[in-house]
């Protein structure tokens, strides 16, 4: 029979999950991470070089999860580095720009590569970003939803500029990862894969490392700002 202290340790066990953002350059991956982690928006486009990451801790229904969120470079010259960063990921967010049909088609290539590397073990999100530019949309909602369903992914719409759907995206992903990787007595606390300390051989350029402890499962209030998505 488990002692009260054993039960307490199980309750406090933290699932660590590695989440990787993939997509072409300028679709808004870095803006999504910045909005989620710091509730900020930078109207100046800055290219991500190789990769950077932030951390986020959540408490969802008494279950603790720590997300190591990896923001990867979308420029073609960095594509070969992709597998280094998304191996051992529990979650993947593939981002496209709803005003750029080519970014949607290329998102399919990222998903094919993910499936080849990770199979169906990864919790998959497809994100149409820049929903604030809906009048300039070139990717139909029907095509996006049908494709997401065909690959076993959930589809989301976001606007980093207006803070629409961003907190909800990461919260839902965290819930899905917890469902797929529930904490158990056989899993030591703070020991799941995806910890930021497990850096790939090539060290990432860190934009910042932010730890926010024990966020509730309620999304943060929406805030706008900036001039780009």
UniProtKB/Swiss-Prot annotation:
Chief place of localization: Golgi
Keyword Mitochondrion among UniProt keywords: no
Subcellular location: Golgi apparatus membrane
Lipidation (S-geranylgeranyl cysteine): 227-228
Single GO BP term: Rab protein signal transduction
Molecular function in Gene Ontology: GTP binding; GTPase activity
CDD domains in the record: Rab21 (cd04123)
Keywords: Golgi apparatus, GTP-binding, Lipoprotein, Membrane, Nucleotide-binding, Prenylation, Protein transport, Transport
Cysteines joined through disulfide linkages: none
Membrane topology: Lipid-anchor
Motif (Effector region): 45-53
Chain spans, region Disordered: 179-229
Protein known as: Ras-related protein Rab-21
Native species: Geodia cydonium
């Amino acid at each position: 029979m488990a002692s009260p202290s054993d039960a307490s340790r199980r309750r406090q066990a933290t699932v660590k999950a590695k989440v990787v953002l993939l997509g072409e350059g300028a679709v808004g991956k870095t803006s999504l991470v910045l909005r989620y982690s710091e509730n900020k928006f930078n109207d100046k486009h800055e290219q991500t070089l190789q990769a950077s990451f932030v951390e986020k801790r959540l408490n969802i229904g008494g279950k603790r999860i720590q997300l190591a969120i990896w923001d990867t470079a979308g420029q073609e010259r960095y594509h070969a580095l992709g597998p280094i960063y998304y191996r051992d990921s529990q979650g993947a967010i593939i981002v496209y720009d709803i005003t750029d049909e080519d970014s949607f088609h290329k998102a399919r290539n990222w998903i094919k590569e993910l499936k080849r590397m990770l199979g169906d073990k990864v919790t998959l999100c497809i994100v149409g970003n820049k929903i604030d530019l809906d009048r300039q949309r070139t990717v139909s909602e029907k095509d996006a939803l049908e494709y997401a369903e065909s690959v076993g992914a959930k589809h989301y719409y976001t606007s980093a500029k207006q803070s629409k759907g961003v907190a909800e995206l990461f919260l839902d992903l965290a819930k899905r990862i917890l469902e797929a990787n529930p904490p158990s007595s056989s899993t030591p606390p703070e020991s799941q894969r995806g910890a930021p300390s497990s850096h790939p051989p090539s060290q990432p350029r860190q934009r910042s490392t932010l730890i926010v402890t024990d966020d509730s499962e309620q999304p943060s209030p929406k805030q706008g700002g900036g001039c780009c998505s």
